[in-house]
Amino acid sequence: SRGSEMCIRDRCISLLKVMLTNYCIYDCAYCVNRRSNDLPRATFSVSELVELTMEFYRRNYIEGLFLSSGVVRNPDYTMERLVRVAKDLRQVYRFNGYIHLKSIPGASRELVNEAGLYADRLSVNVEIPKEENLKLLAPEKDHKSVFAPMKYIQQGVLESKEERQKFRHAPR
């Protein structure tokens, strides 16, 4: 993993761009971390990654975290670990930096929604938009599981917007 930058408007911030693990249960032909690829594998524990992020943040090496992961055990197990990293950073360490989480295709709506409570940004990789191509290159994945997290994120954004509208007109 190496640091990177993200720029919004005229401001760029340095990010720790890291994967929780490069192990993966899937064997997607397009992915370097596919199960059949013979490469060194590594996994952070939740606490290791939280401590590493905080150490870099305290030393002003980074201003935020960009976190992704290979899929270990199943999508919910992996997503739950990503959420725990963000939650621990926010609630235990009072981390005020930027957090961008990659949502795991196939993860439950509840976990994607919980991720949205702690992350500044959620995104989903959609490598293959057509179902027939997905079956060719990633036969263990299905189209619905790839697109579901985007739907969950969109619904969460709309619900949040509705809540803000309600409170904007509340009596003071």
Task: Give the residues covered by each predicted segment.
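Ferredoxin-type iron-sulfur electron-transfer modules and their immediate structural context
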Residues: 1-2, 13
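Short acidic, glycine/Ser/Thr-rich loop/turn "cap" segments at secondary-structure junctions
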Residues: 33-39, 65-75, 99
